[in-house]
């Protein structure tokens, strides 16, 4: 049954929130665990959000054994991976389904995977991935909404990653890990999640060098074996709770983080007038009056596109006018129509939002249509006067584990209720 959040705004947040494992690391790493034809992998700090659940279902359907042996621990054994067609009804629900294609090409030399579904934030074309597969000797075409392999003769190659795409970089590392010869990726993404993936593959016996730089070198090996690995903390989840604290007001410690992964976000929050302190693996945010600050999303280490939406919600309460320019995805301002229902003053011109701050938001029924836009609506709801009902919670669940429980523990008045129920 679909659900909604009912949020009564106005409560200040206080306490400590623990950040889970990075979804954007877990998706490729859980997929890469199935590259191992020997042994089993134990993955720790794995978030239990719906995207990870869907991926585990896909791997089971392909013949892998996947068990959640503890709240944040997965055991994966892929010796019996033998099916090359990912079930359509599962793959279409997952943006990371393209990684499964790379896995199948590497392990089985053939594959058929539905083109990715997920959030309504514009096109995420598979063309970059298809070009990468072609550079490694695999001809993959799109037919009837699915990626289908035709001729596959995997071998190392040199490939330029358009727009420093994170997804394409991930997929090329996965595919090239078992491809004979050496693969060189130029203009590769540098995100911490790329480094995390490379560390795991190397622990399995792979040979990935240069992760975290623009040039990544992968020397293919004959076989990989299972390994133990702890996934890095989710910098996007951490940044979201930091912005929620600034918007709602309060004093919150965000724990289990790597502060250097959030350098740009911390700098922008400080520029916006917030008090931010780093203590080991914790970041403390004390809310202060919000100043308007311009932001342009960029690849890492720039301001993350996945935090653009919560930032817009925060800037909607700032003193002054701010400009937010989105350079990674088109159509990522769709959520602003819902913020406007809550009293925000935002004008969008293609990939730029101009935000004139207001003193407060007012509660209203709103609908989330993507993960981060949903987080932005909750951010606004926490700071709003009155009650806000946020439907489309299934999108939020794709990227955040038990958000309502974590916020309630900080003092927020937030409940998850079935859609259609009377309040």
From Swiss-Prot:
InterPro entries: Enolpyruvate_Tfrase_dom, Enolpyruvate_Tfrase_sf, MurA_subfamily, RNA3'P_cycl/enolpyr_Trfase_a/b, UDP_GlcNAc_COvinyl_MurA. It is found in: Cytoplasm. Phosphoenolpyruvate binds at residues 23-24. The keyword Cell wall biogenesis/degradation applies. It catalyses: phosphoenolpyruvate + UDP-N-acetyl-alpha-D-glucosamine = UDP-N-acetyl-3-O-(1-carboxyvinyl)-alpha-D-glucosamine + phosphate. Pathway: Cell wall biogenesis; peptidoglycan biosynthesis. The active site is at 119 (proton donor). UDP-N-acetyl-alpha-D-glucosamine binds at residues 95, 306, 328. GO terms for molecular function: UDP-N-acetylglucosamine 1-carboxyvinyltransferase activity. One of its GO terms (cellular component) is cytoplasm. Its EC number is 2.5.1.7. The modification 2-(S-cysteinyl)pyruvic acid O-phosphothioketal is found at residue 119. Keywords: Cell cycle, Cell division, Cell shape, Cell wall biogenesis/degradation, Cytoplasm, Peptidoglycan synthesis, Pyruvate, Transferase. Its main location: cytoplasm. One of its GO terms (biological process) is UDP-N-acetylgalactosamine biosynthetic process. Belongs to the EPSP synthase family. MurA subfamily. Cell wall formation. Adds enolpyruvyl to UDP-N-acetylglucosamine. NCBIfam families: murA, PRK09369.1. This is UDP-N-acetylglucosamine 1-carboxyvinyltransferase 2. It comes from Symbiobacterium thermophilum (strain DSM 24528 / JCM 14929 / IAM 14863 / T). The lineage of its organism: Bacteria, Bacillati, Bacillota, Clostridia, Eubacteriales. The gene is murA2.
């Amino acid at each position: 049954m679909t659900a909604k959040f009912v949020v009564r705004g106005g409560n200040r947040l206080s306490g400590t929130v623990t950040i889970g494992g990075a979804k954007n690391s877990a998706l490729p790493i859980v997929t890469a665990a199935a590259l191992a034809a020997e042994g089993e992998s134990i993955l720790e700090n794995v978030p239990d959000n719906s995207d990870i659940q869907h991926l585990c279902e896909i791997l089971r359907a392909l013949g892998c054994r996947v068990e959640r042996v503890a709240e944040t621990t997965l055991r994966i054994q892929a010796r019996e991976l033998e099916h090359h067609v990912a079930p359509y009804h599962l793959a279409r629900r997952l943006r990371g389904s393209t990684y499964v294609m790379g896995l199948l090409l590497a392990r089985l030399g053939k594959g058929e995977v539905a083109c990715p579904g997920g959030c309504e934030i514009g096109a995420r074309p598979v063309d970059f991935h298809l070009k990468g597969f072609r550079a490694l000797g695999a001809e993959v075409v799109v037919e009837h909404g699915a990626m289908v392999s035709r001729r596959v003769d995997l071998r190392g190659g040199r490939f330029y990653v358009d727009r420093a795409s994170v997804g394409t970089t991930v997929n090329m590392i996965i595919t090239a890990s078992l491809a004979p010869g050496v693969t060189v990726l130029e203009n590769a993404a540098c995100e911490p999640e790329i480094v995390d993936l490379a560390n795991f593959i190397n622990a399995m016996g792979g040979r990935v060098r240069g992760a975290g730089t623009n040039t990544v070198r992968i020397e293919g090996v004959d076989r990989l074996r299972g390994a133990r690995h702890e996934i890095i903390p989710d910098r996007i989840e951490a940044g979201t709770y930091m912005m929620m604290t600034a918007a709602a007001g309060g004093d919150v410690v965000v724990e289990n983080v790597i502060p250097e992964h959030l350098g740009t976000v911390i700098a922008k929050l400080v520029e916006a007038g917030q008090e931010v302190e780093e203590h080991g693996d914790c970041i403390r945010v004390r809310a202060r009056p919000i100043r308007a600050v311009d932001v342009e999303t960029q690849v890492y280490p720039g301001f993350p596109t996945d935090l653009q939406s919560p930032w817009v919600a925060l800037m909607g309460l700032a003193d002054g006018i701010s400009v937010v320019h989105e350079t990674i995805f088109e159509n990522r301002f769709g959520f602003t129509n819902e913020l406007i229902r809550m009293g925000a003053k935002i004008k969008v011109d293609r990939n730029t939002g101009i935000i004139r701050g207001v003193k407060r938001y007012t509660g209203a029924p709103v609908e989330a249509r993507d993960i981060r836009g949903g987080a932005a609506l909750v951010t606004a709801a926490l700071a709003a006067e009155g009650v806000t009902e946020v439907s489309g919670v299934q999108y939020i669940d794709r990227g955040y584990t038990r958000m309502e429980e974590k916020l309630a523990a900080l003092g927020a008045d937030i409940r998850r209720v079935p859609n259609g129920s009377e309040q």
